[in-house]
Amino acid sequence: MANADVLKVSILGKESIHCGFHLIPYIAQTVLSNLPSSTYVLVTDTNVANFHLTAFEKEFEQRISSLPTSSTKPRFLSLVIPPGETSKSREGKANIEDFLLLHRCTRDSVILALGGGVIGDLVGFVAATFMRGVRFVQIPTTLLAMVDSSVGGKTAIDTPHGKNLIGAFWQPEYIFIDAAFLETLPSREFSNGMAEVVKTAAIWNEAEFISLESRSADIFAAIQTPSADYAGRSKQTRSIAQELLLSVIVGSISVKAHIVTIDERETGLRNLVNFGHTIGHAIEAVLTPTILHGECVSVGMILEGEISRQMGILSQVGVGRLNRCLKAYNLPVTLADPRIASLPAAKLLTVERLLDIMRIDKKNSGPEKKIVILSRIGATYEPKATVVPDSIIAKTLSEAAKVIPGVPRHHPVKMATPGSKSISNRALVLAALGKGTCRLKNLLHSDDTQVMMAALNELKGASFAWEDAGETLVVKGGEGSLSVPPKGKELYLGNAGTAARFLTTVCTLVQSSPQDNAEYTVITGNARMKQRPIGPLVTALQANGSKIDFLESEGCLPLAIAPQGLKGSQLQLAASVSSQYVSSILLCAPYAEEPITLELIGGQVISQPYIDMTVAMMKTFGVDVVRRKDPVTGKFLDVYEIPKAVYTNPPEYNIESDASSATYPLAIAAVTGTSCTIQNIGSASLQGDAKFAKEVLEKMGCQVSQTATETTVQGPPIGQLKAIEEVDMEVMTDAFLTATALAAVANGKTRIIGIANQRVKECNRIRAMIDELAKFGVETIELDDGLEIIGKPISDLKRGVSVHCYDDHRVAMAFSVLSTVVEGTIIEEKRCVEKTWPNWWDDLENKIGLTVQGVDLASVASEASASGTINHDSAASIILIGMRGTGKTFVGNLAAATLSWTCLDADAYFETKHEMGVREFVHQKGWQAFRDAEFEVLRELIAEKSQGHVISLGGGIVETPAARELLKEYAATKGPVVHIVRPIDEVIRYLNSEASRPAYDEAIVDVFRRREPWFGECCSHDFFNRFGDLPYSSPKATSREIARFFNHITGQRPNLAQNLTSGRRSYFLCLTYPDVTQSFPVIHELTQGVDAIELRVDLLRASKDYDSIEYSIPTLAYVSSQVAALRRVTSLPIVFTVRTQSQGGSFPDAAEKEAVELLKLALRLGVEYVDVEISLSEKKIKELVSLKGSSHMIASWHDWSGNMIWDGPVVKEKYDAAARFGDIIKIVGKANSIQDNFTLYNFVSKVNSTAGSKPFIAINMGLEGQMSRVLNSTLSPVSHPLLPSKAAPGQLSFKQIQNALHLLGLLPAQRFYLFGTPIAHSMSPTLHNTGFEILGLPHHYELLETKEVAEEIKIAIGDSAFGGASVTIPYKLDVIPLLDKLSPAAEAIGAVNTIIPRTTGSGRMLVGDNTDWLGIKACITEQLSSKPIHAALVIGAGGTARAAIYALSALNVGDIYLYNRTTSKAYELAHAFPHAPVHVLEQLGQWPNGAVPPCVIVSTVPASATTTEEETSGILLPSKLFDYRDGPAVVIDMAYKPAETPLLRLAKTAGDNWATVPGLEVLLEQGYVQFEMWTGRRCPKELVAKWLGRLTTDHKQFVFEEECES
């Protein structure tokens, strides 16, 4: 059995690496024979043990038992440890060492490491240090460990500061590579190891790399066929696939072994094996354990290759080859890969974070970062890692770019652009279909050509190989022989439109075969590709007999194409949208069953030069196409005759440079007044865009000279480009974006026509240019087939613009031209240029000579939650669906107002477009015509209004299958689709009274039942629109909930617990009612002090089930109604929990499906926190993670048994599992003694100290565990005495925990003050002390009345117990010198009424703030909710008036009118707010001509200074102040003596729409704000207000701090 044929590899002068198949007997024999010992210890993990431990134990025991009896027989011990990176720690090492000591192992022991890289690194380090070093053997079981970590003697453990930071070089005695182990390895793990194999070939051996490039399918096949009866152990039984696999492994190992032999201790050369690891390890530090080591290194290799390209060392050819090779092994090559981008942790991959992690790297020298730089495939720039500045690394890592304006340093520029995309794709198709071998030179290395080659490869249409270091592609044509890809394999084309159109016809050439296991070929693409039209081409092919089905939207990808061959003969094609439809048929026509006559119909043919190019290229490949002529006029007709033939491949075909790409460097010369020469493109070019220089740039004032193969442009002086009155760009449509960018800075108006087809490219390019130019302040006018651009001087353009590129390469490059003269322009999505010019940004700097900087959008954007993930752009438009009459328009208007967006009703849009209402349209043309037109409107809205809109759709949109698919795709990839839900009985009542829309042909309830499932499948969210009044909810509850919901789901302002995100102590209340409405009478008391409220869904029970003994799972409808009801009485975030019986709840453990449905419902309802038990299947958890949007996931584990030990391996295992998925981790055990709480506390302290740790809820249940509830700082679950029961044993109330924290010294008592005079009758102490008492806070608020700001106040604020102070007249200015900093509000208002002590890294800081404006703002928003405020009036010009103007500015009021008796003071105040729209009124009540009267009035003068009587002193208040009648309005009088001032009295007579707010309410509001600023807790305002109300009734002399100012 032990006679195995092995390949031996030498390392450090010893043949210690033995490679083969089924080697366990060989390993046992070799170890026992050559490494005599008293004890052999095999260490493995639980995963590997399940597969291989028994075989090792059996083999060693048999061989030990057969040893001579005369000698002492050695022992064979085994230790199984938990799997995963967490075992590779100081504790993991100590556990193994303790095992060895316990079993009295000595220095002659031999340790065998059986497992992956973690086991090898860890056990190797144990061997290096145990008894000062013992012998060990590596037996790697993963491909990654075989080719990387097991070879070279590196051993290490991880620390919280990084991976492998503590370790030693300790060479194993043997390394046994048993490739049969790979048969049990998941394919993802195999790919993980292939990253290291590709890396080794890339740095050292190009021949090996070529083999890896071309044989990926064979290599994968080698591990997918199990070897029966130990096949492969001997050479005679070894298959060809096994030989290939072994050669790949041995080849990779040999390179590393050679390098290690030369440089064992990594002083230079050994650095090379870290190619891809500098950046890869940084990525891994953030994404571990979800993304594997090899996957991170794969991305790292591409990024480090791009750094080399940026440095001018590696060509784009090399980067492209590396990219393709890694993709062939299913490895990610970009951080945008869905496997990475969909993870919550991906949000943490900021440039700053990655650079910070990269600082701790063993290759570095001090602060200098070192990266292995490739010079070409198979060679490195230096025989060691190279020092690379942070700026270069940051530029590559950044997702956006900024061009620094200036004159190109390399002027005059002379350069060539990449190969033409159009010609490259045509050449690939021609050569693949042709006979013989063709060498393609100057092929474009881009995303587009990569997907084309990959698709042709999948179709088995040709074979591809590289020569000349990748500069030449060798294509061996398949002569038109094509095969259906295997079942389940789709041809994924991304956003490559050219590939999609060409391959559609190519796939019709496929003939069915008995070997096929699929019935058709499926072509698909990304979300935008699925919107781009391909209908005319498909229609033409279908009419010719091809069977092609649209799988989703009609007229778009994906397509299913049956293998029936192309029939031929007569074809008619509409060619007014894309010339690529024509080229697609032309290219494939020779392979039809009959010669083809192709007739183009449907109006003017688009881009004729590109059709001519196709015909010319076909001729080069041996097929002549005849274009018919009119026999009378001799003019060409749009009819083409193509014979049956087979292309004959020319030996070599040189691809012309891309003319569209050439427009960008030429345009840079034009706009910067410099010279640029483009080689390989001139007047002889077949490409239409080659005319750009003569037809556009010359007319704009440039000097243009052109030969047959070269074009030179000299721009006019900067700022002197001329506008072109009109230019028809129909023959060069792609170049219109470049022309548009130049026209923006030209003198005059430019009109561009002939480009209608650009609306259906990668994006709607005409709209994209219009929208993005508007950010610069450039005016444009959209035309039916183009646009007009009104140019502006460069100096007048707005600076610092961030350009959205719509994932469109041409948009990005066009705006990079404009950015060369406009400072601060940020080009988002810089990587979208990889479609046609992957190294554009490098060439811009290296060849043109303009500095390009990377921009990390994460640091530019406002800081978001570290763990939240939004699956869409937060500006993505929201689509509302639902039955007619559910309130979509009502909700949409309020949502749009909240977000400052535009609400767009699809019915109104339809009416404008078709110039008739829906009812009339249906009457004239019927329902089907209406549904078709309605669907087109939906497509148009999604394309045209993709951002900043709330779009309300008609209820019947879901009747159209294509519309449902479009809505589902939008919800999955673009933005929220919200289903507005309303009880059906309310809907019926409303519709029976409504007459503006066509009546249904059937009962409303039947329509509802049919559509309800469709609404559910199309939406990403549900919003319950409750119209009826709910007891204990405020009248404004609906509008407040709409604001909360839409701010949350868009990610604009997620409704998360602020104390949690800021790191302070946080709590949630556990509701235990079967019906939450039972809590509403006491909801304000229940929620005192907490940050969130838990809805225990497993405890819910509808009233009909109260008497039932059996547990009944609550229905989705009941749970939805409970959430909706709770939303109307509290704005606190909801924690949605479905606790199962085994984890202490009531939900059945076996009902996983029902639990997941409820959790999905929570995410659809926009619930903020969703508790997900990690006992659910991983697949279900990942599905929930993918849906969570702005919601956060609490990954929880509960163990009621009392057996869970906080310092045992199980807790760490559960913690790591929860950390993979959760934004917050929750582990709950049961305390058996008080000591268990200290063990818990130590565990929490340890995991919280690691970099990037997540918020952690750790609690022990039971009476003995109450201390853990006090010490827990993250979302502690609390009860309340008013609840019917506690949710868990040992639960405490919020107040009890505060008392305990105080007794433990964790919540010291603080002193708060009111500074001012006179203040004896102030109610501020009552307000704050009542709040402290209710919440159980140990603080005290008192008066400090002094004659001046003197020593007493200085002593108070200097005391360590000082918690904060209110400041009133006359000290609002006098205290400022005592403070360290003022808030922006205090600076703008010019006064301080609040002092807040803040702790910083350098000590304590006193911050002055002003909360007056927040009190005013709160009172306005309470009455007007999210309604936009068109105009407001402020009366007075003192300090309170400043606060009012500041508040109104914060509310984005359209116009602020200011009146004061002393007009000069009013103007003085207006000048203090230069950026606010303040208009001084000469006469009160006289508004500017045509202006709408204000809907907000704030008076800041004493009541005694106002009057409603003529002929009396004071400001006369005219009744026309309250002329506004078009909606809710509010008047605030800051005076509170008397309770009803003349202004408020007048308002009450004005109209029902005017709400009145007395000054006392404002003062209370600003006091509540102060309370929260100081304590971090919301003031229990309802209870405080009740108490104060009683006091003010009983003691009229009690007042607040100040009267209003005159």
Swiss-Prot record:
NAD(+) binds at residues 45-47, 85-88, 116-118, 121, 141-142, 163, 181-184, 192. Pathway: Metabolic intermediate biosynthesis; chorismate biosynthesis; chorismate from D-erythrose 4-phosphate and phosphoenolpyruvate: step 2/7; Metabolic intermediate biosynthesis; chorismate biosynthesis; chorismate from D-erythrose 4-phosphate and phosphoenolpyruvate: step 3/7; Metabolic intermediate biosynthesis; chorismate biosynthesis; chorismate from D-erythrose 4-phosphate and phosphoenolpyruvate: step 4/7; Metabolic intermediate biosynthesis; chorismate biosynthesis; chorismate from D-erythrose 4-phosphate and phosphoenolpyruvate: step 5/7. Its cofactor is Zn(2+). InterPro entries: Aldolase_TIM, Aminoacid_DH-like_N_sf, DHQ_synth_AroB, DHQS/DOIS_N, DHQS_C, DHquinase_I, Enolpyruvate_Tfrase_dom, Enolpyruvate_Tfrase_sf. Transmembrane segments: none annotated. 7-phospho-2-dehydro-3-deoxy-D-arabino-heptonate binds at residues 132, 148, 154, 164, 196-199, 256, 270-274, 277, 293, 362. ATP binds at G882, M883, R884, G885, T886, G887, K888, T889. Residues 1309-1606 are annotated as: Shikimate dehydrogenase. It is found in: Cytoplasm. Binds 2 Zn(2+) ions per subunit. Its EC number is 4.2.3.4, 2.5.1.19, 2.7.1.71, 4.2.1.10. The AROM polypeptide catalyzes 5 consecutive enzymatic reactions in prechorismate polyaromatic amino acid biosynthesis. Homodimer. This is Pentafunctional AROM polypeptide.
